[in-house]
């Protein structure tokens, strides 16, 4: 496991996608968290879409901004491949430019040195390769040569972002978003979990800094927990009751793995049904279950982050509920840290409140 350089201690962060159309407002909200991130704002521009951002300079790709479509042509890929390889050692090839994310560059303009850490994100090559199709509607991950280039390309983009963020804060980290990972466990997928594990492990090995994965879907949890990741971010509000029953979660924590518990719902109707007390009780139920299974409770608290359950672009009130969820998240974190004495210098209390 790679050291994060700070103690998680149930501090707050969040996934990247936000419903805002005001860049400065989105940044201000993101910066209220203990570990802020640069927001992805697809309602501002199609360039702010996480798939579009990841494909800047990838051979064979054309971005149709007017119709908001990504086009990939296999013959064009091979035509552009020699030129791409000529530029593959140039960091500029993998840099996220202002055209593809004005928000990212606004984030980098801020003074971020006083935060315990900062975070970035990039779409996983697995989810990207399953989402983008060629001219025959075939996912590009099914093409062996395209897949090989894609994994290397995203790996270099993650590393480039990590280096840029680290200039703003030495404890920066970047996690990969993997919303489509669950698809590889389907019998209908032409890209299965065996190949996926091989490719993912090789991809993770080449990442600089802490290696994190975020997802809101429900994959085979063993697949991730036994991989080479240092950080797992997931929707614990909906999936926590399942994942705590995996023995591999105990092993993950014992080897130093960090869990980001997505606990605060961002859908209006769900958030309205919850309170700080109910969310805290839900979390403590998961933690007590793990404690009974032999997970050291102090260690678990030290190695936990808290986050919203999911991103959300669907609420009728647009950003209002999401901003409320961030407020609730910060309040929940404060309550937990007070109860378990989670500071940078103190050992946390156990689940029953004892030192």
Labelled PLM ranges:
Residues 1-142, 257, 289-293, 302, ...:
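Alpha/beta catalytic barrel-like cores
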Residues 230-342:
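Catalytic-face loop-and-helix region of soluble metabolic enzyme cores
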